[in-house]
Amino acid sequence: MQSHIFSAVLEADQFEDGAPAFHAWCPALKGCHTWGHNQQEALARLEEAVELYLDDLRAAGEPIPVDPERGVIALSSPAVVVNL
């Protein structure tokens, strides 16, 4: 089992209707981004988006990107990541 840790960017934004929002994305995964009403929601949605993105890569036979310079770390054992 491998664990992958992806760096995320989270910034204040707004929805199309002007309501406050947070935009979250992973720089190493082109096009993998989402929004939420608060930071926690945006990060939770990003976690789901990353899982779906990686599922699509695996289904297509593509490798999961590993590039520490772009914020992607692979570990050869299970890991727990805690955001504080």
Cite the ranges covered by each PLM segment:
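A short, exposed loop/beta-hairpin motif centered on an aromatic-Gly-Thr core
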Residues: 30-41
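Short, charged, surface-exposed hinge/linker loops at domain edges
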Residues: 1-9, 44-84
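Short aromatic-glycine-(Arg/Gly/Cys) micro-motifs in beta-strand/loop hairpins
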Residues: 10-27
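Structural detector for hydrophobic anchor residues on beta-strands
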Residues: 6, 22, 32-34
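ATP/adenylate-binding site constellation spanning eukaryotic-like Ser/Thr protein kinases
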Residues: 26-29, 47
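Short, charged low-complexity linear motifs
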Residues: 7-12, 39
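ATP-dependent carboxylate activation and anion-phosphoryl transfer catalytic cores
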Residues: 2-5, 16-17, 30
